[in-house]
């Protein structure tokens, strides 16, 4: 009896499965992305597959560096959620390594499978909820312009207003970068408008920007939700710890990470025509950061 640990790479090669995969993800300080990464790592580990993790800062140099790193590690495929896809060349470089699965985004013009949530439905429903509270002056702290996920969430907010009889073109729109600081700065601008123009509800494209907006309001003596209602998107753990707790849309980050790995494994074994899963369902979570507007 030879006591030995079977080599995972050899075992996976024997069964025609990946032995190492890459994960390109942005902003691990954001609890959504860290939960997604945990889903990827846990699911890969269940199959004895290693994950090479690359975190990016949304620059072309970082994207190219990640492609070089993953090539040097001889990964068998890549899960990609960097949010920076103006540099399509780096994605083509990644495709040369093996299958590429997008998660939480789609890229027009590139035929890449993706694992996403139904964010448009989520923002549509949460916007309708806020309108039903009596709000009429809205602003949206949207994500980066020209990003598919950001556009879907903005479209849902606009549809929700229209479904409740409001004119979506009247909603002020400012684009942030999904980080807390941009939510803070945009809220500072919006809440500094003349009172007759100031929004009574801020619809944010993610929780981090919503938290930044809430922090600006707290530091400036603006009461949430008495003076302004604020909603987010993701339902990161921090959203439940705020005071007031954040009304938001919950999307299943961990399960999306798992789904991306499962799709990648299927592609490595069966070829590139594997069918992506249907969009993951989302849930509107009503908490204390939204209420009826103050009577004028």
Pin down the residues of each PLM region.
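Periplasmic-binding protein-like
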Residues: 74-82, 139-141, 173, 195-206, ...
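Amphipathic helical "hinge" segments at domain boundaries
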Residues: 2-77, 162
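Short, well-structured alpha-helical segments in soluble
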Residues: 63-74, 182-196
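Flexible loop/hinge segments that line or gate small-molecule binding clefts
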Residues: 57-58, 80-128, 146, 166, ...
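Flexible loop/turn connectors
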Residues: 189-296
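Hinge/beta->alpha junction and helix N-cap segments in small-molecule ligand-binding domains
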Residues: 25-35, 53-62, 114-125, 141-188, ...
């Amino acid at each position: 009896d030879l006591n030995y640990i079977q080599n995972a790479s050899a075992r996976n090669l024997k069964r025609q499965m990946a032995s190492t995969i890459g994960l390109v993800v942005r902003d691990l300080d954001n609890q959504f992305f860290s939960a997604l990464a945990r889903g990827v790592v846990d699911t890969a580990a269940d199959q004895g597959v290693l994950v090479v993790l690359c975190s990016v800062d949304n620059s072309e140099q970082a994207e190219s560096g990640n492609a070089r790193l993953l090539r040097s590690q001889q990964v068998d495929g890549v899960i990609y959620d960097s949010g920076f896809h103006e540099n399509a060349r780096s994605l083509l470089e990644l495709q040369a390594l093996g299958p590429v699965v997008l998660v939480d985004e789609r890229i027009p013009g590139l035929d890449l499978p993706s694992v996403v949530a139904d964010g448009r439905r989520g923002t549509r429903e949460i916007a309708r909820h806020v309108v039903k509270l009596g709000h009429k002056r809205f602003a949206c702290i949207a994500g980066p312009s020209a990003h598919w996920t950001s556009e879907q969430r903005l479209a849902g907010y606009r549809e929700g207003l229209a479904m409740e009889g409001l004119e979506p073109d009247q909603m002020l729109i400012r684009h942030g970068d999904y980080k807390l600081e941009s939510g803070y700065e945009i809220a500072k601008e919006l809440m500094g408008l003349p009172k007759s123009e100031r929004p009574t509800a801020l619809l944010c494209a993610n929780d981090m920007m919503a938290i930044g907006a809430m922090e600006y309001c707290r530091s400036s003596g603006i009461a949430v939700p008495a003076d302004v209602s604020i909603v987010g998107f993701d339902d990161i753990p921090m959203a439940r710890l705020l005071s007031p707790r954040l009304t938001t849309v919950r999307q299943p980050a961990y399960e999306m990470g798992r789904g991306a790995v499962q799709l990648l494994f299927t592609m490595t074994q069966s070829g590139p025509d594997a069918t992506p899963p249907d969009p993951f369902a989302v849930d509107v979570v009503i908490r204390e950061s939204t209420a009826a507007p103050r009577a004028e």
